[in-house]
Structures are given as structure tokens and as C-alpha cells.
């Protein structure tokens, strides 16, 4: 595997590029799935050792490069923000809005569906340049979706980026998906600057949002700007570090004008500047020393401390403005240059498969052997488009790279930099760059090298699907139907397809109703396939609450070659686990290794379809510690069958339970509908966790069984006159109510009898 130091591999669902049984571990001793999280100080020590290995050319190229993602809660203004970035960096000549009247739409929303719905569905990459202090800096920029149903797009972007801009709404503050994005940034150790957007909106309060960032996200954050004016009177911002007022002028805010701090803001500027220094003193030793000596740090010392603390992921500087009002965006571009890391300041490591998976540090030098990660696939006009982050070495047009997983050597016939759905051909890209290429048959998460190295990379965390529905093409010609499903599965690891042998139906699974609805619509538009879908179904899980011993013999001997396999051991519950585990403790070789491997396969298959209702099994440990073989009749099939039967027997004796997905629900609505919304949540068996009352609207956060949430969007619209909005995110699995469990088991048994 390959991982950024500190990444904890996700085990909640199959990982892109891995087998479908990746959540099951097989070893002769208990398997530990967690990895040690390194501190930034440990990373820094390794980076200091790598630095002398870089040439001046490598260092210079790296210093001028930033790989940045734009992330936020839905409707916080990410895509509008990115549109301004493209305009001010000269990448586009005119600004178009997400829901523009000209029917053009924002550049980064290239799909028709995105422009129609006004949301980002796929992450989009672009490349632009920004000039600061007479130097030109190059940004690889990825705009990500804000809706939880498309969370894999955020995961795969943050997996390969070095820094991020977290966009927060000045009115709504930290919202449910903001918390999710924060968790994703921590998972991949991505430092961030924060931009408080929509400062021109009524009710905007940046300092309340900063307080929420500190309290809810638990990361020290402080303003480095204060607004000039408020709401519709927003005129600009004051840079409190330099004590300079900055105004956006021109038809699109393209001209920056500086001036003295307005008289009525001087006290606020000094107050927030003192708070900034105090916050930095808590996270940076050099500022702490100056602070304790009761001296005032210089401007350069403050900026250096912000950079150190931001890259160390101990602090986030907060800027503010309004993307829609063309205010404050250029300041964020300056902050990206000043405070976010370049590729040589981020430690990435890999495992050398040729040396028993020894950990190796990747060197961000273009003179080193090539190592890259395919992190995203798209079907383009010219075939499969594969996005690759280059960690080490170079990629050249006409050159060859090797897929470490398959061993297949492929030629790079075309190399491009992406600009949303447009592309620009390039001859080569170096370490730290992000590019795309055509004609490579691979999966998302595959590692590529120049063929001299056998380094392997881990893929991104892939959450488990929580909702399924049956899907059938209206036409008997299923060629395009199969093509679409195969393509979508390959592109999106959270989109799963299976054939149900009992109902004889194709079943698709994903992260939510919108997620699956989008794919059904894309089939119609892109493949001309009209589909009929069934009622959404919850992805339940089966588990146990106690343990049981087993001693099972599978015997089939009726003359000639037969089958014989005996397995003994126990089945037990793994507390708070999203995995299943198989282990052996055989003494004296009573069961040969080849039969134990068959036992592991039997366990994997048994976990795919539980005994209660045929859903996947979760949180179970199976130990085989004894058994017996027959000199003639024992074989792999016999031991696989014996293991599956032993599993079923012990499972039903271990207090089996059906688990249902519990969702984290966040509902925001005008205050006058609060009673209606609370009543609606109570009907859904929701447990309300928190209620926040704002000036005009309120937000309720609750935990609710997914089973009760179908049709919630319609109910919420009816209860709030169409003014309420909500977001759903999977929280955890919990035992379903006894009544629901009985009903599910009865329905399953009835289906089995009808077969």
C-alpha cells in the first residue's frame, strides 16, 4: 500500500482496486487494520532528510506549485468561488454563474445535469497561474461536490492534494457537510485555509463562523481579515496583519485598490490582530516566545508563523468576502501561495512490494524513477481518461509506464492538463504535477511506475453503500445497459452493481437516493437507456452479540472420490468493528495451509450472505483451531463447504441481530416552521442531538434510521412550504427494533419458501 503518513486506511467498504472481500482479513494470528498516525514533527524530520536529495531545479519548480482542492457544505459557494479564481487568473474571459441566465453555467460544472440542478456532481480539475511578488505560481485546482451522496469525489481529490480551501457560509456557519469535509481533510492530513463566503448576505456573521470552526471542527482558527461594511454594504476587507484596507473595483472586482484602515474599524482591527497573535502563540513556539516576552511580532514573523502552523495542520487562517459579489477572492489566492504547502513540503510514503513491503519515502524529484497514482477515471470522447498524480519522476508523451497491480506495460500516447471538460496537450509533467492520459486500462487507485520499481499505493477511503434499488431496462436490448453499469462502477467505487439470483434482478447500490437517481438519469442521457427502478431498499447488516463454539464435519462418501473436512473453533463478536476477521491457530499441521486458504474463502463467502435475511455480515471473528482430514477424500471444496456450514451453525447460536444504518440528518428551515419540522422528525423515530436557532432560520441535527427516511424530501417540502433543506450522512450501524427484525426475517423466509 501507499499512503500519506498518518492516513488511516478505510475498512468500511471495499477499496478501489481491491477485491470485493477487502474487509476480511486472513492471517494465522489476529489481524490489526489500523496504522499509526504520525505527528507533523515526525514528518518534518523525514522531509529535512529528503531535502538535500532535491536539485535546485526540483526545489524551484516545487516552490511555484500548489495542488489545491475547494471543499465545503453544499450551496456554500464553492463553484462560484472557483469561477472567480479562473477569471482572476486569466483562465476564462467571462464569469458565468452556477444558475446563470445565459444558459452557459459555471466552467467547472461541465455536465448538463450539474448546470440544470445547480450542484456539482463530479470533481473537476483545472490548471491556472497566479502572480505574486513578481513570481508566477501554478495551481492544480480541483472543485469538489458538496452533497454527501458524491462524497467519493471529495475523498479521491483530498487523497492526492497538498492543501485545500475550506469554504464556509457566513450566514449558516459550520454545517453538517462542513464537519464531514473536515474529517476527510484530517484523514489525508490536508492543511487548509478557510474562506468565509457570502459576506454580502443578510445575517452574515464571520466571527460567529470562526467560533464554530474552533468549537465544532476543533481546529484553532483566527481571522486575518475583517470586513469593511456588512451585508449589502460590503465594500472590501482589512488585512489585519499588514493593517491595510483592500477594495475590489472594476466591473467584476478585478482591480484591487489599497488604502488606510477606516477610522471606525481601527479598534476592531487591533482586537482581532491581538487575538490572531494569541492564537498563534498556542500553536507555534517562535510566536509563543515573543508573546511571553510581551513583544509585538513583526509582519514577517506573523506570516511565517501562520505558514508553519497551517502546514503542520495546527491552525487555519480565515479570510472573508463574497464570491458572488466579486470581493476578497484575490486575497485567498495570495493566501494559497503564502500559507499552503508546495509538493516538497508534504511527506508521501509507499511500500516496496519487492522488499517485503518495506516502507519507502517518495522523493518529489523529476530525476527519480517515476511513481504515480491513478486517482480518477472518466469516459471521454477519446476513450477512458485517467487522472494521475505524479509523486516522483516524470511522465512523458510517447514513454512507457507499468501498472504495478497487473504488471502490464502501457504507452502514453497522449498527455493532457485538464481545464474542466477541456484539455491541453503537454509533452511531459514532473514530480508534484497532476495530469491525465488516454488509453490506459486500469482501476481507480492503481499505482504506476517506470517498471524499475514495485511500489504500491493505497487507494482512498471508500464508504459502504447504504441504499439499493432494482433496475431494469425498458428495452430488451441490454448492451448499452451493461456498458453503462460497467463504466459507472469503474469510475465510482461507491456505485455497486450486483445480480440478485433470487429475484433475477440487477440491483444498484450507492450513497443515497440522489446518487442513484443521477446514474439512472445519466443512463438515459448518455446511453439512451430508459430504465424502470424498484422501491429503494436499505442495506442492512447481520451480526452477532455473543460467541459460540463449533465442531463441524462435512462428509460425502459414497464410493470413489468423496469429500471430507472437519473444522473446530469458535465464532465471536468484534466490538465496534466495521470488518470481519478470520484467523487460525492450528498446531501440528492438522489442517494443511492449502485447506486453510479454502476455509478463508468459505468464510468470505459466508459473510457476503448472512443466515438471517441474506445481507452482508459485519463484526464477526472466526477462529479455526483444530480439525481433521481424510487421506483420500479431503480437498479444498470440502473444507470450504465445512467452514460455511460451521459459520452458519455458530452464527445462529450467537444471539444473531440485524443492524440498520443510522443516518446523521441535518435540517435547516425558516424559524416559523420549527414546530412542523420537530413533529416530522419525531414521526421518523429520530433522536434530536442539537438545535441551533439563528436570526431567521434554525438547524436541527438528529440521528435517524435510514429505513424511515424514504420520501423525507417530499414531507419536508410540504412541512416548510418548500423552504426547508436537509442533508444525510451515514453515521453507524445499530440493532434494528425487535419488531422490524421479526418482519425482515419473516419476509426473507417467505421469499425463500416461494423459490
From Swiss-Prot:
Q: Where in the cell is it found?
A: Mitochondrion
Decide whether keyword Protease is in the record: no
What processes does the entry annotate via GO biological process terms? mitochondrial translational elongation
Under the heading SMART domains, the entry gives: EFG_C, EFG_IV
Instruction: Please name the InterPro entries in this protein's record.
Output: EFG_II, EFG_III, EFG_III/V, EFG_IV, EFG_V, EFG_V-like, EFTu-like_2, G_TR_CS
- State the PROSITE patterns in the record: G_TR_1 (PS00301), G_TR_2 (PS51722)
Residues that bind GTP, according to the entry?
72-79, 143-147, 197-200
Q: What is this protein called?
A: Elongation factor G, mitochondrial
Which species expresses this protein natively? Kluyveromyces lactis (strain ATCC 8585 / CBS 2359 / DSM 70799 / NBRC 1267 / NRRL Y-1140 / WM37)
Q: Which classification does the entry list for the species?
A: Eukaryota, Fungi, Dikarya, Ascomycota, Saccharomycotina
Amino acid at each position: 500500500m501507499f499512503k500519506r503518513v498518518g492516513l488511516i486506511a478505510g475498512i468500511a467498504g471495499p477499496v478501489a482496486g481491491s477485491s470485493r472481500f477487502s474487509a476480511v482479513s486472513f492471517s494465522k494470528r489476529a489481524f490489526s487494520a489500523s496504522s499509526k498516525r504520525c505527528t507533523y514533527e515526525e514528518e518534518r524530520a523525514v522531509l529535512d532528510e529528503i531535502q538535500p536529495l532535491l536539485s535546485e531545479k526540483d526545489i524551484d519548480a516545487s516552490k511555484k506549485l500548489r495542488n489545491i482542492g475547494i471543499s465545503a457544505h453544499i450551496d456554500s459557494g464553492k463553484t462560484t468561488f472557483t469561477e472567480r479564481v479562473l477569471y482572476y487568473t486569466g483562465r476564462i474571459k467571462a464569469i458565468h454563474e452556477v444558475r446563470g441566465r445565459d444558459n452557459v453555467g459555471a466552467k467547472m460544472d461541465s455536465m448538463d445535469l450539474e448546470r440544470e440542478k445547480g450542484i456539482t456532481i463530479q470533481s473537476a480539475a483545472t490548471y491556472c497561474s497566479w502572480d505574486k511578488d513578481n513570481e508566477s505560481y501554478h495551481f492544480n485546482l480541483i472543485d469538489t461536490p458538496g452533497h454527501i451522496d458524491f462524497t467519493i469525489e471529495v475523498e479521491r481529490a483530498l487523497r492526492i492534494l497538498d492543501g485545500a480551501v475550506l469554504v464556509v457560509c457566513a450566514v449558516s456557519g459550520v454545517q453538517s457537510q462542513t464537519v464531514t469535509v473536515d474529517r476527510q481533510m484530517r484523514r489525508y492530513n490536508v492543511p487548509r485555509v478557510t474562506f468565509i463566503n457570502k459576506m454580502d448576505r443578510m445575517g452574515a456573521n464571520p466571527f460567529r463562523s470562526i467560533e464554530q470552526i474552533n468549537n465544532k471542527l476543533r481546529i484553532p482558527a483566527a481571522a486575518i481579515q475583517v470586513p469593511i461594511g456588512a451585508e449589502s454594504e460590503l465594500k472590501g476587507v482589512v488585512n489585519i496583519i499588514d493593517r491595510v484596507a483592500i477594495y475590489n473595483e472594476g466591473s467584476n472586482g478585478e482591480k484591487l485598490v489599497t488604502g488606510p484602515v477606516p477610522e471606525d474599524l481601527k479598534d476592531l482591527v487591533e482586537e482581532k490582530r491581538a487575538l490572531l497573535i494569541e492564537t498563534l502563540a498556542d500553536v507555534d513556539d517562535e510566536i509563543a516566545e515573543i508573546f511571553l516576552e510581551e513583544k509585538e511580532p513583526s509582519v514577517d514573523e506573523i506570516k511565517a508563523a501562520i505558514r508553519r502552523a497551517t502546514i503542520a495542520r495546527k491552525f487555519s487562517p480565515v479570510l472573508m468576502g463574497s464570491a458572488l459579489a466579486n470581493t476578497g477572492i484575490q486575497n485567498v489566492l495570495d493566501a494559497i501561495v503564502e500559507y499552503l504547502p508546495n509538493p516538497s513540503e508534504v511527506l508521501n510514503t509507499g511500500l516496496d512490494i519487492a522488499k517485503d513491503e518495506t516502507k519507502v519515502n517518495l522523493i518529489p524529484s523529476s530525476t527519480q524513477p517515476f511513481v504515480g497514482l491513478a486517482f480518477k477515471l472518466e469516459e471521454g470522447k477519446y476513450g477512458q481518461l485517467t487522472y494521475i498524480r505524479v509523486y516522483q519522476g516524470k511522465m512523458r508523451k510517447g514513454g512507457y509506464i507499468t501498472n504495478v497491480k497487473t504488471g502490464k506495460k502501457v504507452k502514453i500516447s497522449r498527455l493532457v492538463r485538464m481545464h474542466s471538460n477541456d484539455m491541453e496537450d503537454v509533452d511531459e509533467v514532473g514530480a508534484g504535477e497532476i495530469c491525465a492520459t488516454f488509453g490506459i486500462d486500469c482501476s481507480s487507485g492503481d499505482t504506476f511506475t517506470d517498471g524499475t520499481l514495485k511500489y504500491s499505493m493505497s487507494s482512498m477511503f471508500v464508504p459502504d453503500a447504504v441504499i439499493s434499488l432494482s433496475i431494469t431496462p425498458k428495452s430488451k436490448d441490454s448492451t448499452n445497459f451493461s456498458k453503462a453499469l460497467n463504466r459507472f462502477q469503474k469510475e465510482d467505487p461507491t456505485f455497486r452493481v450486483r445480480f440478485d439470483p433470487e429475484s433475477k434482478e440487477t440491483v444498484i447500490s450507492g450513497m443515497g437516493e440522489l446518487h442513484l437517481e443521477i446514474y439512472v438519469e445519466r443512463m438515459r442521457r448518455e446511453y439512451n437507456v430508459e430504465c424502470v427502478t424498484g422501491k429503494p431498499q436499505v442495506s442492512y447488516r447481520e451480526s452477532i452479540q455473543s460467541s459460540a463454539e463449533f465442531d463441524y464435519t462435512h462428509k460425502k462418501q459414497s464410493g470413489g472420490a468423496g469429500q471430507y473436512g472437519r473444522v473446530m473453533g469458535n465464532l465471536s463478536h468484534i466490538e465496534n468493528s466495521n470488518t470481519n476477521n478470520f484467523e487460525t491457530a492450528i498446531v501440528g499441521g492438522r489442517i494443511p495451509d492449502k485447506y486453510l486458504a479454502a476455509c478463508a474463502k468459505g468464510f468470505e463467502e459466508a459473510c457476503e450472505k448472512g443466515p438471517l435475511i441474506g445481507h452482508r455480515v459485519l463484526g464477526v471473528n472466526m477462529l479455526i483451531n483444530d480439525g481433521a482430514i481424510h487421506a483420500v477424500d479431503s480437498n479444498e471444496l470440502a473444507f470450504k463447504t465445512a467452514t460455511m456450514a460451521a459459520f452458519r451453525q455458530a452464527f445462529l447460536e450467537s444471539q444473531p441481530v440485524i443492524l440498520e444504518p443510522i443516518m446523521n440528518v441535518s435540517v435547516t428551515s425558516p424559524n416559523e416552521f420549527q414546530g412542523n419540522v420537530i413533529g416530522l422528525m419525531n414521526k421518523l423515530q429520530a433522536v434530536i442531538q442539537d438545535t441551533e436557532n439563528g436570526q431567521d432560520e434554525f438547524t436541527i441535527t438528529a440521528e435517524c434510521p435510514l429505513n424511515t427516511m424514504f420520501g423525507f424530501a417530499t414531507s419536508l417540502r410540504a412541512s416548510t412550504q418548500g423552504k426547508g433543506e436537509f442533508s444525510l450522512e451515514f453515521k453507524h450501524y445499530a440493532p434494528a427494533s425487535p419488531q422490524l427484525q421479526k418482519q425482515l426475517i419473516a419476509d426473507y423466509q417467505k421469499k425463500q419458501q416461494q423459490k
